[in-house]
Structure formats: C-alpha cells, structure tokens
C-alpha cells in the first residue's frame, strides 16, 4: 500500500496552510509540491512521515 503526501496530510487533519507552516515553507510552495508541479525535498517528506508516524517506504512521491 502506498500513500500520497496529500493522503498523509488529510489523515493528520491538517490544511495545506498548516502543513506548509509546519515545514517552514509558503502555502503556494506547498500547493505546488503536493500537486506535483514541484518536487518535495527529501527532508520535507521525512518530516511529514515522522509527524504521521508513517514509514518512508510506503510514501508515493
């Protein structure tokens, strides 16, 4: 089973704005990354997975 970053965020009951703030990036930047226009940095994905207690192995990027 693979999870997208969006699925993880929704599972955490966080808005895009809240997740962007958690990562220390702008909301627009986060939206671009979540929609696939830009790529997430590895450390951003790692931080999201840590917050959600999800293994990096099951994240679909």
What are these regions (language model features)?
Residues 2, 58-61:
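Short hydrophobic/aromatic patches at helix-to-coil boundaries
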Residues 3-22:
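Short basic helix-loop element that most often maps to the first helix and adjoining turn
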Residues 6, 31-32, 60:
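Key DNA-contacting residues within the recognition helix of helix-turn-helix
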Residues 9, 23-25, 40-45:
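A broad helix-preferring feature
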Residues 15, 26-29, 55:
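Short coil turns linking two alpha-helices in DNA-binding domains
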Residues 16, 34, 44:
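Acidic-residue sensor for enzyme active/binding pockets
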Residues 25-39:
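Recognition helix of helix-turn-helix/homeodomain-like DNA-binding domains
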Residues 41-58:
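DNA major-groove recognition helix of helix-turn-helix/homeodomain DNA-binding modules
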